[in-house]
Every structure is written in structure tokens, then in C-alpha cells.
Amino acid sequence: MATDVFSSKNLAVQAQKKILGKMASSKYIATSLIDDTSGEVLDELYQLTREYTQSKKESEKVIKNLIKTVIKLAVLYRNNQFNEEEIALMEKFKRKVHQLAMTVVSFYQVEYTFDRNVLSKLLNECRELLHQVIQRHLTAKSHGRVNNVFDHFSNCEFLAALYNPFGPFKQHLQRLCEGVNKMLDEDNI
């Protein structure tokens, strides 16, 4: 995003992205920027990821990358940094995330409907749309963060373990779906 023209607004947006990206590393600051329901869902995703990976470091990295990405996306959106094409892609991304959330909850609520390939495909469609939205705004490092998050959550083995009705993650899935359902009810997703 290098240009020869100085722009205070662009400089301010870059500073916001940088500061909020650093702040997202602190759980206290991140929770102050995220509503209670979203925080509960993120906490559940962290616990689930930690138990699945058996790695505190890896699970913290995935959730931190998710939070940083969401915050940077919000900064760009609130500062009107997207052109018309990107706004259209952002709307498409929001609809796809909403569809994903409804599918996650539906697969939990209706027995024997879970299909890991469907969820993985939806997650990867979200990833591609997000990459298109942020293409000209965020660095390769930020794109790597997006891939880290989606690589983890779209992994078919992870999804199969999560939805296994006899597996160790049943309670996590229940709490996760309750939170996602609440976010859907509140129009937060």
C-alpha cells in the first residue's frame, strides 16, 4: 500500500491496525474490545483447540490470530477503507460466515446430519473471501494469520473429532453452539 502521496487518514488507519493488533495479544485488552458472547465463544474455541492439539502455545496462537484478524478487519471497515468491490466481497463474506454459523449449530442440533466436508468447504470459502477483502490492505503476515486460523478449524480430522457424539469434545461443542446460537439471535454473526 505504498504511495507517493502523504495521507494523514491512511497513516491513522495504519497506526490503528498496528496498535489494535498489538493490543489483541493481551487477553485483557482483547476482551474489552469484544462483547461477552463473542468472548465466551472465543474462550470455548481456545479450550477446544488446546485439548485437541494438546498444545497451549499452538492454541493461543490460533485464537490470537483470529482476534487480530477480526480487529484489523473491523478497523478497516469502520474507517471506510474498502472500495465498492471490497464492500461487496465483505457483504458476501458476512453472509457466508452467517451460513457457516447456522450450519455449525444445525449439525449439532440435528443428529446424524454432520458432514465434515460441508463444514470444511464453508470454512475454506470464508477464507478465500476474506483474503480477497483484505488483499490490498493487510500484509503477507496477516494473510498468514488468516491461513493459520482457517487451516486449523477447517481440518476434517478436527471437525470429525469435534462432532463425534461419543468423543471428548461433546461439552465443548454444546457450549460453542450455544454461544454461536446466541450470537445469531443477537445478529452479531
UniProtKB/Swiss-Prot annotation:
The family note in this entry says:
Belongs to the TNFAIP8 family.
Where does it reside? Cytoplasm
What would be one Pfam family of this protein?
DUF758
Query: What is one cellular component GO term in this UniProt entry?
Result: cytoplasm
Q: Which GO terms describe its molecular function?
A: cysteine-type endopeptidase inhibitor activity involved in apoptotic process
Q: Which InterPro entries match?
A: TNFAIP8-like (IPR008477), TNFAIP8_sf (IPR038355)
Its annotated function is as follows: Acts as a negative mediator of apoptosis.
Tell me which UniProt keywords the record has, alphabetically: Apoptosis, Cytoplasm
GO biological process: any one?
apoptotic process
Q: Mostly located where?
A: cytoplasm
Cytoplasm in keyword set: yes
Organism name: Xenopus tropicalis (Western clawed frog)
Question: Would you tell me the protein name for this molecule?
Answer: Tumor necrosis factor alpha-induced protein 8
Transmembrane ranges?
Answer: none
